[in-house]
Amino acid sequence: MASILELRSRIKSVNSTKKITKAQELIATSRITKAQSRVAAAKPYAEEITKVLSELASASASLDHPLLNERTDPKRAAVLVVTSDRGMCGGYNSNVLKEAEELFQLLRSEGKDPVIYVLGSKGLGYYTFRDRDLGGAWTGFSQDPGYSDAAKASRHLVDLFMAGSGSEVPAPNGEGTIEGVDELHIVYTRFVSMLTQSPEVRRMAPLEVMVSEEHVELGEDMLSNGHGSSNSEPVAGYNFEPEPDKLLGALLPKYISTRIYSSLLDAAASESAARRTAMKAATDNANELVNTLSRQANQARQAQITQEISEIVGGANALASSAGSD
């Protein structure tokens, strides 16, 4: 058994660590509420731009836009992987990176070359350590993303997609050029609840379009949790100026930015929830470890006292025996 001094030193060390994990837990808890509020605040805009684009697509003379049309022979697919800038969030990053690897395998099996783009320092470090080629990376805002952060990534990715494979566009860092792509995908973590966060894969371009007899809708819409726009409500009539085709071309890139921004907000809430869960588990484990070490220290102290008493009694008996023999 370890000595009492060693056990007390370990108890002190664990208590110091527990203070850190408890503080991180409280900070993450406060950030979850803010992140959820931002998700809720962004939802009305996301829903309205989806409705307007659906109306534009319905009023358009044709749906002949690169962001809506499937490429005949897609060769390259850009994948935007959303990770965190900081650690101590349990399996948050490993889960989304695992989901991304599965997507890469699927794309390769379809004959497409995946081009990796990363949001977050953890993802950047993961791929850099493994010597994986990256098309670009954006870091420093995973916990508090702004629309401008999403727009920076969106501008480059839309340019990349509009160029298509075989054409070159400037690299996001301004150094050299990079070949265009035929598909855009995003891998992020969707916030379900405080205890559940689900890694998700979504294709951003070309957008899926569902055409009915009277209406056109954008399919697989993640801006309204996958439910799309509701047909149960009366639809207002629109008079578009300029022509619907021109408006559609102007709004579709903004729609891609909105999808990325919505994913970043979801990921920020998921990151805080995962960090809170991980830090709470660490704090609980620290409490259990302190209790165990305290019990061992008490047992060691009790054994030491018992040994000291035994030595005193033994010495007294020896003295008594020596005095009796004299």
Swiss-Prot record:
User: What membrane topology is given?
Assistant: Peripheral membrane protein
| Name of one Pfam family that matches | ATP-synt
For the keyword Kinase, the answer is: no
> Which GO terms fall under molecular function for this chain's record?
ATP binding; proton-transporting ATP synthase activity, rotational mechanism
One cellular component term (GO) for this entry is:
proton-transporting ATP synthase complex
**Keyword DNA-binding applies:** no
Q: Which domain of life is it from?
A: Bacteria
Q: What is its main location?
A: membrane
Q: Example GO biological process term?
A: proton motive force-driven plasma membrane ATP synthesis
SUPFAM superfamilies per the UniProt record, alphabetical: ATP synthase (F1-ATPase), gamma subunit (SSF52943)
Described by its record, this protein's role is as follows:
Produces ATP from ADP in the presence of a proton gradient across the membrane. The gamma chain is believed to be important in regulating ATPase activity and the flow of protons through the CF(0) complex.
Q: How does it assemble?
A: F-type ATPases have 2 components, CF(1) - the catalytic core - and CF(0) - the membrane proton channel. CF(1) has five subunits: alpha(3), beta(3), gamma(1), delta(1), epsilon(1). CF(0) has three main subunits: a, b and c.
NCBIfam families cross-referenced by the UniProt entry: ATPsyn_F1gamma, PRK05621.1-2
Question: So what family is this one in?
Answer: Belongs to the ATPase gamma chain family.
HAMAP family reported in the protein's UniProt record: ATP_synth_gamma_bact
- What this protein is called in its record is ATP synthase gamma chain
From which source organism is this entry?
Rhodococcus opacus (strain B4)
